A protein has these predicted regions:
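Flexible phosphate/Mg2+-sensing switch loops adjacent to catalytic phosphate-binding sites
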Residues: 57-60, 101-132
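Short alpha-helix boundary/capping and kink motifs at helix termini
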Residues: 1-81, 199-200
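Short active-site loop/helix that positions an aromatic residue
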Residues: 87-103
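Conserved catalytic-core segments centered on acid/base and nucleophilic motifs
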Residues: 78-90, 200-204, 220
């Protein structure tokens, strides 16, 4: 039976909706974008947005790149194979915008971050983007939930993981940059982001196909290393109930050795193996 690969271009408001329930598998690397990548993204958006007088729908669209998902056509659940850095950063940007636009816009932004639960019938909030287990609670509390950004900006210095520190640093960067804009400019940026910015969504229900696509569709973001691909292959093959355990072991060793040295280790292993 042939593997189905589906690719479609979608505006961002069609990404952060009920059609997708994104999850970052434990074998993925932690959030790694710094203010270099986040700053470039925001600068590009503002440059494309251009003249304040031009109607939003007449402004040239902006292509955000592609994301690769493991997703069945009849389900909203989508494991992110490639694109987590962009989706996480876009979520941070939306959260910061929510804190700086009028309430009627802020309420709409919340719908893009999570579907509100119902206390009467006992349903929980349904978050559009679910980070890896170790960062999930932090991300929900300080990014996705209302007033989270204010709490993050005032968060006293404490022990944060590298990925959590990157989340906080990028949120502070966006907050400072957006403060330099007028309120109408922030609203205009929000409208442009959701209506005129596009992602190509590549999805397949097949894990192997997703990883093959993953190796050739990393056009933006941090450069992948062979160890990233190997990690995805190895950890992805482990039963799901053990993936978090072995991901922690893998990342602990990578942190101890350093990313570049860890990469070199596999080159040496390969040379030994070939002998």
């Amino acid at each position: 039976m042939p593997v189905t690969i589906h690719a479609v271009e979608k505006a961002l408001f069609k990404i952060f909706n009920n059609d997708f329930l994104f999850a970052i598998p434990p074998y993925q690397r932690p959030y790694a974008w710094t203010t270099d990548q986040a700053g470039e993204l925001l600068s590009d958006l503002l440059a494309f947005l251009g003249d304040d007088a031009q109607p939003i729908d007449d402004v040239n669209p902006y292509f955000l790149g592609s994301i690769v998902l493991i997703k069945d056509a009849d389900s909203s659940k989508a494991d992110i194979v490639d694109g987590q850095q962009r989706l996480t950063t876009l979520t941070i940007l939306l959260a910061v915008l929510r804190a700086q636009v009028p309430s009627e816009y802020a309420q709409e932004i919340t719908k893009y971050l999570y579907e509100r639960g119902d206390v009467i019938i006992g349903t929980l909030n349904r978050y559009r983007l679910n980070l890896r287990e170790r960062d999930e609670k932090f991300f929900r509390e300080y990014i996705q939930d209302e007033n989270g950004i204010n709490g993050l900006l005032n968060l006293e210095k404490k022990q944060l993981s590298d990925s959590q520190q990157n989340i906080k640093t990028n949120a502070i960067y966006f907050n400072n940059a957006l403060t330099e804009l007028t309120e109408p400019q922030r609203v205009r940026l929000l409208q442009y982001l959701m209506r005129r910015c596009y992602l190509v969504v590549v999805s397949t229900p097949d894990l192997d196909s997703a990883f093959r696509i993953f190796t050739v569709l990393n056009a933006r973001g941090l450069d992948l290393k062979l160890s990233d691909l190997l990690k995805a292959e190895v950890i992805g093959a482990i039963p799901k109930n053990q993936q978090e355990k072995y991901t922690e072991i893998w990342e602990s060793e990578e942190e101890d050795l350093g990313r570049d040295t860890f990469q070199d280790l596999f080159a040496h292993i390969r040379m030994i193996y070939r002998k």
